Amino acid sequence: MSGTILENLSGRKLSILVATLLLCQVLCFLLGGLYAPLPAGHVTVLGSLCREDHARQNDTSFLLYSRGAGACIPVTREEVEQDSTKMANELVHVFQMPLPRDLRDLDYSRWQQNLIGVLQVEFGYDSSSELREPPRELQLTIDMRLAYRNKGDPDNGWKLYAHGVEHRYLDCVTSHVGPTETLYSCDMIPLFELGALHHSFYLLNLRFPLDTPSQMNLQFGHMHDLTLTAIHQNGGFTQIWLLLKTMLFPFVVGIMIWFWRRVHLLQRSPALLEYMLIYLGAALTFLNLPLEYLSLVYEMPYMLLLSDIRQGIFYAMLLTFWLVFAGEHMLIQDAPNKSTIRSRYWKHLSAVVVGCISLFVFDICERGVQLRNPFYSIWTTPLGAKVAMTFIVLAGVSAAIYFLFLCYMIWKVFRNIGDKRTSLPSMSQARRLHYEGLIYRFKFLMLATLVCAALTVAGFIMGQMAEGQWDWNDNVAIQPTSAFLTGVYGMWNIYIFALLILYAPSHKQWPTMHHSDETTQSNENIVASAASEEIEFSHLPSDSNPSEISSLTSFTRKVAFD
């Protein structure tokens, strides 16, 4: 039997391979740390006040803008205060993005991929009012109109992108108490999310309709400053990210083809671990496929959802593989039958299934609906927020249970190996050296698996933080977030690349000999190998099942044989 490359590769060649992969890992970290900006950037826009004609209020094609030819005449705060009705149902809050800089109009780039808007609301009451602390979960009704135009379009060439009347719930605190007015500042609320940043300029019109019979927006007094924070993916980070994907994609495809060809050259059906490796490589290939290049030409609002699905498939496959990888090296063969996912691992994978389904349902409820209505958010209602939090907590608990169980399985593997090592002194010298080398290599690989699992969890958390939080310090030479994200992404590719190489079947064939001749022949091999610079841990003859891909898994049978 030939065994795997991990078992038969010489120490020098293995050291060169590991050193090369570690160098590639360092380069992935440096690529993100030295050349990539923060994953997300933002711009803060203070809303401009415009007054609209009553006759155009229900005309969704009528859009007000604050810059350029034909812009509306801005209304000052003093004019609003002097009006007896505070210009109710006449005011439009206008946000034009992006803001100009140094007297030069800026535009969005398609490299920036997506755009998210969150709103900070400030409103006031007359101090004569008895209300001092507003009630919690105030319902605010907003008429929202989002428009766009591109380079070369006239200043008034805005086209409606989406329109909706949505409800948001506010939690506010008192920010200022004056002699005539009390101001309240509210928490940020999600406003819109665009899965594709395809156009050059965007315009947002917000109206807060008042209606006495339905009590619409009557509990808010009058609006003061509205601040919109528009968050986008940084174009420089997207370029580095796609460069990394473009470079890694052909290498993973090539090593998968090479691995599967070597498996099919054997006179047996592929083992479970070999199937899992090729499935894992396929999931990584799907993740590496740089589909984002298409968004530079076509408008693809579903790209965010597609990216989440691709990453979810990879996470599910990676977590499944780790359990099978540890389970197949437990050195316990309960039954002579071939291992299958359903027969041996369905209990182990329950946490993975629950967590992945929870996150998938949450993603469909959020970004799936946003394909038709970019103003929708599951977090905007108390019930929706509780449901979303339930899914996230359920996924988090499942992840914690999974990681603890994976650590337990790896600990059990190490314990079993330790128990079996007590049998090594009774073996022949050649066989003892063979298994000591295999055990050392396997322990190193399992520790690398634990490190990869820990960094994967940390990378997932940092990725989620990058979507919702922003670093306000612009004077940082190396951005840890970008370095970490590119480093973890490179680590996935390097780790799977190494597994496909090390667990590929070796084509080295070793002569079959009788047990009585084994010690003499093996000692001669050791003497001959010692004269060389490379000592290979050759796969010694055994009576193991030909369907096993690692001689370490048949260690127990070897002990009995000796």
Curated annotation (Swiss-Prot):
Annotated gene: wls
Residues carrying a glycan: N58
Function recorded in the entry: A segment polarity gene required for wingless (wg)-dependent patterning processes, acting in both wg-sending cells and wg-target cells. In non-neuronal cells wls directs wg secretion. The wls traffic loop encompasses the Golgi, the cell surface, an endocytic compartment and a retrograde route leading back to the Golgi, and involves clathrin-mediated endocytosis and the retromer complex (a conserved protein complex consisting of Vps35 and Vps26). In neuronal cells (the larval motorneuron NMJ), the wg signal moves across the synapse via the release of wls-containing exosome-like vesicles.
Lumenal side of membrane: 35-239, 292-311, 366-390, 463-482
Name of protein: Protein wntless
Keyword flag Transmembrane helix: yes
Single GO MF annotation: Wnt-protein binding
Keyword terms: Cell membrane, Cell projection, Developmental protein, Endoplasmic reticulum, Endosome, Glycoprotein, Golgi apparatus, Membrane, Postsynaptic cell membrane, Segmentation polarity protein, Synapse, Transmembrane, Transmembrane helix, Wnt signaling pathway
Disulfide bonds: none
Disordered: annotated span: 539-562
Subunit structure: Interacts with wg; in the Golgi. Interacts with Vps35, a component of the retromer complex; wls stability is regulated by Vps35.
Membrane topology: Multi-pass membrane protein
GO-annotated biological processes: imaginal disc-derived wing margin morphogenesis; intracellular protein transport; positive regulation of protein secretion; positive regulation of Wnt signaling pathway; regulation of intracellular protein transport; segment polarity determination; Wnt protein secretion; Wnt signaling pathway
Sequence ranges on the Cytoplasmic membrane side: 1-13, 261-270, 333-344, 412-441, 504-562
Residue intervals passing through the bilayer: 14-34, 240-260, 271-291, 312-332, 345-365, 391-411, 442-462, 483-503
Extent of Polar residues compositional bias: 541-556
A GO CC term attached to the entry: Golgi membrane
Protein family (similarity comment): Belongs to the wntless family.
Organism placement in taxonomy: Eukaryota, Metazoa, Ecdysozoa, Arthropoda, Hexapoda
Pfam families: WLS-like_TM, WLS_GOLD
Localization terms from the record: Presynaptic cell membrane; Postsynaptic cell membrane; Cell membrane; Endoplasmic reticulum membrane
Highest taxon above the source species: Eukaryota
